C-alpha cells in the first residue's frame, strides 16, 4: 500500500471515530502527518509504511510536538522488520506507540483496545498484578504453589504481581486456571508507553531560529526539524506554533499553521524576516522580525495573538 493511500485510510478512520482532522500537507521530510482532535483527546500522527524507518530525530520532534500540544504521539504503519504489524498488537519505537491501521480502527472506532505488545522475543501482555495476587491468596496459594502450576519460578510470580508483563502462553494458562481475566488492555491515548528507547532525554537539534531575545522575556523555545512550523514557543501556559523565514517561504505555510493551530486549540505565529508590520492570515499572526523585537514582554505578544477561540479580524499596522 502506498503511503498516500495509507494516510487516506488513517484520515478516514479518525473521521469515522468523530475526530476533526487537520489538512493534508506535502512538506518533506516531516515529523508528523496529521493532527486529530475529539473533545479532550488530541493525537499527533506519523504515517509510514515501515515503522523502523522512523528516525530518532523524527520521533523526538513527534514527541515534543505532542507533549506541548497536550496530546499523544502515535505512529501508524504496515510493517516492522520483515513482518506485517499484528492486528491488536502495539509496538514501541523510541518510546512512541506504533500500530497498524486495523488496530487503530479497532481502538478508535470499535472501542476495542489492544491487549498485546511486541517486544524482543515475541508478543507479550500486561498482567493486573493486584488481581493476580488476590486470586492467589483467595486459594491460599504461595508464590511457589502458583509457580509450580504455571511452570515458572516463585520469583517470576512475584514479578507478575509487581506489574511485569508475560507471554501470551503464560497469560492464557493463568486465566484458564483461575477462570477469570487478569490481562490489562493498552490505552493508546495515554502518554505512558514503556520508554526503554525514548528520545525525550536527548537534546533537540532543530534549525536555528534567532529567538534568543524571546527567551530573555521568559518564553521557552523548542526548535523542530520536520514540522510546518520551525518552533514551538511556550509562555504562561500558552503554546505558540511558530514559523520563521522570508515572506515568500513563510506566508505559504501560514494557512497550514493556522489550520493546525485551530485543531490543536493553540496560538499560531509567522515571523517574517523581510516584513515590517503585522497582520492576521486566518488564525495566524504574521509579524515582521523587527516588529517582534519591539515587544516588551510575553503578555504583549499574547495580546497581539488574540484569543484562541476568537474569529480573526484583518489587521495591518
Curated annotation (Swiss-Prot):
Highest taxon in the source lineage: Archaea
Keyword annotations from UniProtKB, A to Z: DNA-binding, Transcription, Transcription regulation
InterPro entries in the record: Arc_TR_HTH (IPR020886), Cro/C1-type_HTH (IPR001387), Lambda_DNA-bd_dom_sf (IPR010982)
DNA-binding region as annotated in the record: 143-162
Transmembrane segments: none
Keyword Transcription: yes
Domain HTH cro/C1-type, residue spans: 132-185
MF (Gene Ontology): DNA binding; DNA-binding transcription factor activity
SMART domains assigned to the protein according to its UniProt record, in alphabetical order: HTH_XRE
NCBIfam families in alphabetical order: PRK04140.1
Protein name as it appears in the record: Putative HTH-type transcriptional regulatory protein Mboo_0195
Protein source organism: Methanoregula boonei (strain DSM 21154 / JCM 14090 / 6A8)
Amino acid at each position: 500500500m502506498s503511503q498516500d493511500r495509507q494516510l487516506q485510510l488513517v484520515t478516514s478512520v479518525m473521521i469515522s471515530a468523530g475526530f476533526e482532522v487537520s489538512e493534508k500537507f506535502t512538506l518533506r521530510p516531516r515529523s508528523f502527518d496529521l493532527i486529530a482532535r475529539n473533545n479532550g483527546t488530541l493525537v499527533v500522527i506519523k504515517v509510514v509504511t515501515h515503522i523502523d524507518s522512523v528516525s530518532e530525530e523524527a520521533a523526538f520532534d513527534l514527541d515534543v510536538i505532542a507533549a506541548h500540544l497536550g496530546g499523544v504521539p502515535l505512529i501508524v504503519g504496515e510493517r516492522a522488520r520483515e513482518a506485517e504489524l499484528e492486528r491488536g498488537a502495539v509496538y514501541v519505537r523510541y518510546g512512541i506507540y506504533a500500530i497498524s491501521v486495523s488496530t487503530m480502527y479497532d481502538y478508535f472506532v470499535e472501542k476495542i483496545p489492544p491487549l498485546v505488545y511486541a517486544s524482543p522475543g515475541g508478543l507479550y501482555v500486561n498482567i493486573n498484578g493486584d488481581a493476580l495476587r488476590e486470586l492467589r491468596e483467595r486459594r491460599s496459594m504461595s508464590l511457589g504453589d502458583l509457580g509450580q502450576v504455571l511452570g515458572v519460578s516463585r520469583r517470576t510470580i512475584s514479578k507478575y504481581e509487581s506489574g511485569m508483563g508475560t507471554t501470551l502462553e503464560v497469560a492464557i494458562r493463568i486465566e484458564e486456571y483461575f477462570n477469570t481475566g487478569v490481562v490489562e488492555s493498552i490505552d493508546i491515548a495515554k502518554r505512558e508507553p514503556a520508554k526503554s528507547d525514548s528520545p525525550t532525554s536527548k537534546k533537540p537539534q532543530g534549525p536555528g531560529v534567532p529567538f534568543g531575545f524571546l527567551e530573555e522575556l521568559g518564553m521557552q523555545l523548542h526548535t523542530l526539524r520536520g514540522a510546518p512550523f520551525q518552533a514551538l514557543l511556550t509562555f504562561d501556559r500558552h503554546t505558540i506554533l511558530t514559523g520563521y523565514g522570508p515572506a515568500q517561504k513563510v506566508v505559504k505555510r501560514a494557512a497550514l499553521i493556522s489550520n493546525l493551530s485551530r485543531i490543536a486549540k493553540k496560538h499560531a505565529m509567522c515571523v517574517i524576516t523581510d516584513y515590517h508590520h503585522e497582520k492576521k492570515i486566518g488564525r495566524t499572526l504574521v509579524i515582521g522580525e523587527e516588529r517582534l523585537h519591539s515587544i516588551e514582554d510575553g503578555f504583549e505578544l499574547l495580546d497581539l495573538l488574540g484569543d484562541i477561540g476568537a474569529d480573526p479580524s484583518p489587521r495591518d499596522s
